[in-house]
A protein has these predicted regions:
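FIC/Doc superfamily catalytic core
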Residues: 1-106
Length: 106
């Protein structure tokens, strides 16, 4: 399993805000690393091997973790899709992705 790093999440967020409106910045620069470390900890110590379970954990952690001043849900979606892509998972286009992302943040 090829995991995603905090730096990759920050880069994804920055790329999103280059293209779309949003307030740049991070209230706590260490939060990205803390959130990703927590996800990696769960994977390691709970023996999680299911890619979709890890993807769900990533999406929820990023969307609810409020790493950034703006764009957390967009970043959560794109980071999760990137994680799945780098692990050779192909997804069909679906309008449900937006709904799932909003639900993950609730």
């Amino acid at each position: 399993m090829r995991l995603i790093t905090a730096q990759e999440i920050i880069q994804i967020h920055d790329d999103i805000l280059e293209r779309l409106a949003g307030v740049k910045g991070m209230p706590d620069p260490g939060r990205a690393e803390a959130i990703i470390s927590r996800v990696h900890h769960h994977i390691l110590y709970e023996g999680i091997t299911d890619l979709f379970e890890v993807a769900a954990m990533l999406m929820i952690a990023i969307a609810k973790g409020h790493i950034f001043n703006d764009g957390n849900k967009r970043t959560a979606l794109m980071a999760t899709l990137y994680f799945l892509f780098r692990n050779d998972v192909k997804l069909k286009k679906s309008n449900q992705l937006e709904d799932w992302t909003v639900e993950a943040a609730i």
